[in-house]
């Protein structure tokens, strides 16, 4: 981080229209993969006033009542009345999902599972930094926590006049690669019309901002912008059209690391846009946890239908204890980054994805979860179980 003195990242709540779309797409994936682990799913969602549209390509033996599922996701988020502008119980739901192209299938499917080809060409990045306890950049961590707290305050009834749509933004000040302060906080939250701006700003400041952000990083010069435009009554899909895959920087590292451009939500693990990005995070986090570097960014790339990555590259930004070339060699020794091997390594064939679709895919805590008779661990790419093997291989 030494090249920046200030860095800003943003996040959005689960009620933001683009995040509604992401959560619907991943709910569809989860419902299908719960019945058919090897299904091929690519589900895109659009939400706008009074309508939710799901489209894409799915090949599966599962049967899911997709209309009911879409409605449940929308209602669970908090859009359950026309008073808030969008109602999952009464909105139109349109399903235009088709089957996966046979041309793609022939490039992915193999008689030997380990030879499974990548579902598309592309490049993916993973990143980790030791500036926070979860080895993530601080600005995106703090931004996620603000909107997560907003949802908690809304759903618990602590601030009952809050509505689902919200956005946050945090600017951190760095010195010698360490966060030394928060210079600016922006939080815009949708609300009921009866609450005054004064009451809203005071409550949000005390019960969301100060409750969430580390007090030692807030200072007399910190700027606070709470609903800076005034009223935010009209929000969600009424205020803006929502689409799957439009919050890829929110989903990843808040702009601190590069991004290959591929979105995550609605895609089964055969799509390397998702699985290889998760593997990239797993590799980078273990490198930092092992003490091989303070910061690490990995890029992997693939060709459609080919199992082995076409490239693996590492950048430790001058913080490495060994050379970047040596770390690439260690990665090749300790991690199998073929698509099938990633799926096996991270145990990805479970209905774990809707939870990833709000508040970031990275920096989360693995939890054991049971769906039906399937018990599994979520966020497996956040484990640091290969750090010691990397240290040993590096001779540290």
Swiss-Prot record:
Flexible loop, as annotated region: 100-110
GO biological process: one-carbon metabolic process; S-adenosylmethionine biosynthetic process
UniProt pathway: Amino-acid biosynthesis; S-adenosyl-L-methionine biosynthesis; S-adenosyl-L-methionine from L-methionine: step 1/1
Keywords from the named record: ATP-binding, Cytoplasm, Magnesium, Metal-binding, Nucleotide-binding, One-carbon metabolism, Potassium, Transferase
EC number: 2.5.1.6
UniProt cofactor(s): Mg(2+); K(+)
UniProt entry tagged with the keyword Magnesium: yes
SUPFAM superfamilies: S-adenosylmethionine synthetase
Catalytic reaction list: L-methionine + ATP + H2O = S-adenosyl-L-methionine + phosphate + diphosphate
Cofactor annotation remark: Binds 2 divalent ions per subunit. Binds 1 potassium ion per subunit.
Residues noted as binding Mg(2+) in the record, renumbered to the chain: 18
Top-level enzyme category: transferase
Location(s) in or outside the cell: Cytoplasm
Disulfide bridge partners, by residue number: none
The keyword Transport appears for this protein: no
GO MF entry, a single one: methionine adenosyltransferase activity
Family matches, as NCBIfam families: metK
Self-association and partners: Homotetramer; dimer of dimers.
Family the entry assigns: Belongs to the AdoMet synthase family.
Function, as annotated: Catalyzes the formation of S-adenosylmethionine (AdoMet) from methionine and ATP. The overall synthetic reaction is composed of two sequential steps, AdoMet formation and the subsequent tripolyphosphate hydrolysis which occurs prior to release of AdoMet from the enzyme.
HAMAP family linked: S_AdoMet_synth1
Protein name: S-adenosylmethionine synthase
The gene coding this protein: metK
